[in-house]
Amino acid sequence: NLYQFKNMIQCTVPSRSWWDFADYGCYCGKGGSGTPVDDLDRCCQVHDNCYNEAEKISGCWPYFKTYSYECSQGTLTCKGGNNACAAAVCDCDRLAAICFAGAPYTDANYNIDLKARCQ
């Protein structure tokens, strides 16, 4: 769920607030369209697509689905015992948090004009 995703981001990118990723580029945050502005925004586009795939699992609501995972020294592990939906959502969030950690953050791409830059 979104709370767990926030915690995963804080695990892999402890130097930044999770909020910095909530309104970044064209895809980080609610919705998404157009061409990603950079690698970090591409991470969010992939995450959005991953959630779309997870939603194809019967009764799976990624934004609200809880799952079992562990954060140890910046390393994320989705635990066994998750059902198909929980496992899929956990993996979406884990891969995005790892992607965020490896992508440069450009302050100028925070809170951009979506209408002008994301067509």
UniProtKB/Swiss-Prot annotation:
This is Acidic phospholipase A2 natratoxin. It comes from Naja atra. Binds 1 Ca(2+) ion. Its EC number is 3.1.1.4. Keywords: Calcium, Disulfide bond, Hydrolase, Ion channel impairing toxin, Lipid degradation, Lipid metabolism, Metal-binding, Neurotoxin, Potassium channel impairing toxin, Secreted, Toxin, Voltage-gated potassium channel impairing toxin. Snake venom phospholipase A2 (PLA2) that has an effectively inhibitory effect on A-type K(+) currents (Kv/KCN) in acutely dissociated rat dorsal root ganglion (DRG) neurons. This inhibitory effect is independent of its enzymatic activity. PLA2 catalyzes the calcium-dependent hydrolysis of the 2-acyl groups in 3-sn-phosphoglycerides. GO terms for cellular component: extracellular region. It is found in: Secreted.
